[in-house]
C-alpha cells in the first residue's frame, strides 16, 4: 500500500500509520486520526477470519457501516480495506498472493476518491 501511495506522488512524511487493537476499532481509530490531522483520505486495513460462529459477520458489518457513516458525515474518504476470508490461506491470497493485494486496492481507491473530492471542491459550477 505504501509503495502505491509513493508511486502516485505521496510524500513519505505525509503517510501516517497507526494501529488499533482489532478490526472492530478501525472506525474509532480512523476518526481519531482524521480529527488530529488534515488528511486527503483514511485507509483502514484489517482482516477478520471467519470462525465457528457468526461473530465475524457482526464485526465486518459494524466496521463497514462505521466507515461508511464517517465518510458520509465528514465528506472525507474513509476506505474499507478489510479482508473477510474464511481462512488464513484465503487471507494470504488476498494480501499479495494469487488473488491480488487488498492494500494496493485500498490505496488506489483512496487516491481516486481524494482526486474526486479535490475535483468537485475546486469546481465553481453547480451540478445536479
What are these regions (language model features)?
Residues 2-21:
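Glycine-rich phosphate/diphosphate-binding loop of Rossmann-like nucleotide-binding domains
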Residues 20, 46-48, 83-87:
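Short, ordered loop/turn segments at secondary-structure junctions
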Residues 25-67, 71:
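Glycine-rich phosphate-binding loop
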Residues 74-90:
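Mobile beta-alpha loop/short-helix "lid" or hinge segments that flank ligand
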Residues 86-100:
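Phosphate-binding/catalytic loops
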Residues 100-128:
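A charged, well-structured terminal subsegment
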